[in-house]
Curated annotation (Swiss-Prot):
InterPro entries: PP_kinase, PP_kinase_C_1, PP_kinase_middle, PP_kinase_middle_dom_sf, PPK_C_dom2, PPK_N_dom, PPK_N_dom_sf. It catalyses: [phosphate](n) + ATP = [phosphate](n+1) + ADP. Catalyzes the reversible transfer of the terminal phosphate of ATP to form a long-chain polyphosphate (polyP). This is Polyphosphate kinase. Gene3D superfamilies: Endonuclease Chain A (3.30.870.10), Polyphosphate kinase middle domain (3.30.1840.10), Polyphosphate kinase N-terminal domain (1.20.58.310). Residues 1-46 are annotated as: Disordered. ATP binds at residues 90, 515, 611, 639.
Amino acid sequence: MTEAQTRTEPSESSESSEAVAPAITSAADSAPEAPPATTAPAIENPLPEDRYLNRELSWLDFNARVLALAADPSLPLLERAKFLAIFASNLDEFYMVRVAGLKRRDEMGLSVRSADGLSPREQLRRISERTQQIASRHAHVFLDSVRPALADEGIVIVTWAQLDDAERAKLSTYFHEQVFPVLTPLAVDPAHPFPFVSGLSLNLAITVKHPDDGGQHFARIKVPDNVDRFVELPARGDSPGVVRFLPMEELIAAFLTVLFPGLEIVEHHAFRITRNADFEVEEDRDEDLLQALERELARRRFGSPVRLEVSDDMTESMLELLLRELDVAPGDVVEVPGLLDLSSLWQIYSVDRPGLKDPPFVPATPSAFGERETPKSIFSALRDGDVLVHHPYDSFSTTVQRFIEQAAADPNVLAIKQTLYRTSGDSPIVNALIDAAEAGKQVVALVEIKARFDEQANIKWARALEQAGVHVVYGLIGLKTHCKTCLVVRREGSTIRRYCHIGTGNYNPKTARLYEDIGLLTAAPDIGADLTDLFNSLTGYSRKESYRNLLVAPYGVRRGIIERIDREIAATRDGAEGRIRLKANALVDEQVIDALYRASQAGVQVEVVVRGICALRPGEPGFSDNITVRSILGRFLEHSRIIHFRAIDEYWIGSADMMHRNLDRRVEVMAQVKDPRLTTQLNDIFDSAADPRTRCWELGSDGHWTALPQEGHSVRDHQISLMERRRHP
């Protein structure tokens, strides 16, 4: 499993930057909108100033929920180790982006306060306090629970002191042949300045003593990141089936005298630094965007430090030296008992012990597309009606991937246009687009090369597509293209028909097995016309005046959603049963939150299911007492965005979260789902999430998340229930 598969998309950089917006409009800007309802009357009760929760602390609460899964003894053991790794990777990215952005604003003297009234410095202080708590909890869940449980199951992480002489002799051979040649001990003295320490690298800080004059010097060794973190030991004859691992830093520490011959090793400690990765490309209309991005990627390596993790046995003098030389503030130090960088537990997760993992699940193929062994033409199926796919319960490879591959191979297909935000290393989607271009089809790929931490991969794919003859567009100046859309143009007799896919998740077959997402496959003429207009806006200079069934950011998603909330309010006041159900990764945008508060005041029942950040404060009498907020975490990463307005009877799916970055600085697409067969599927998802027995966390008005159901009550798992439905429809 790759890092990209575990990414939980915690954040982007500063939310305050302005975007240069290209000519894209949406349904909210146009006449053919659904008929507006009467304006909702003014609310008598004003909204209080303290109505928002802090987004940064809310994100840390999200990661604490991930940690709660790692601590849950009812989960398979290696899945618990996986959640420890995910927690660590998440926290790394949070510091690289969110904390880095706050530090920059604080250092520049920018006094802009967060929506809940905190200055950057106040937020940094609270983040530090909260991080110390959950980082300590993270380490102890591993040390006191998961590591001993792994040992009981025959997966043992040992120390050097636990090895016998024969094992040490074998490891000595391994060290000298495989590890020693790639190590570079770096001493610090007047002739050797303090070495550059790359971000997220694991290092040993060492004090050596010269026997002649007793002089002590600091040295640093980087633990190589191109070898396994854990060295697997040969099996013992007296312990069949037991797998044992030694951390690489322990192996290196055991042979420091080989690296520093003739010197006394006084002390050694592990440390790890996190650097600022919150860089924005300075986009100039007169400069090649690809060149600008590559220049920025080179700078990212040298970002300023934002966190220093050290082993908790590090001496005060060693810590002071690191703080001084790395220019790290004492408040940015995290002392860790035990191993640093538990993201490397992915290696332990890969041990072949299926009994310690979730049982395998084979995704289904929607009946409209035939059986896996006897597939039906996607095009003929879509002519019969729209199809809603729900990954990973519905197979990505036999639905969306097959749609694109069939389009590439079909001689009647004239053109394929697609957005690509993140895709897999060996992408069948990209290969299909290349095949289509080489077969003479018109192929357009909008590759978002600014997708954070996937920039290099996307640059590689963009160049491969260009070499095959694909028309590649490298995103838009000032915006990220985050929408998930594909348009296929096909000749059928004397007519042209357009087939479309609009989704909530990336065109990535690997993450599609791990991320929960929704996709709409349709041959509806109005959606085909909408996507044609959208791609013309993305690739050219046209300005679309109206969309029929889409809301498109950066102009129309927020406006369209708030308009529909207002219509729901008006319908409720006219006697309808008002209800808004919203599923998203994050709910931060103040304008959307305030609209939901107004809905609650008007008697509309609001049910929010959010995976991560939530700045809305539910359950407060007078303004949010009709709002509930739940969070569901589990085997799959909840990633779909769905909205249902009951009184006005509208369902929408799409790529946009309710965040400033999505609504103001990205191209996002939300599509209306109209077919009652498909809206029933969406209702089933909401009903399952809202079931009182569903394992989840519920947000209180004080910002505290409570695990539900309470002990002693019947429990069901939302994701397992959806898997069972696919097995037994």
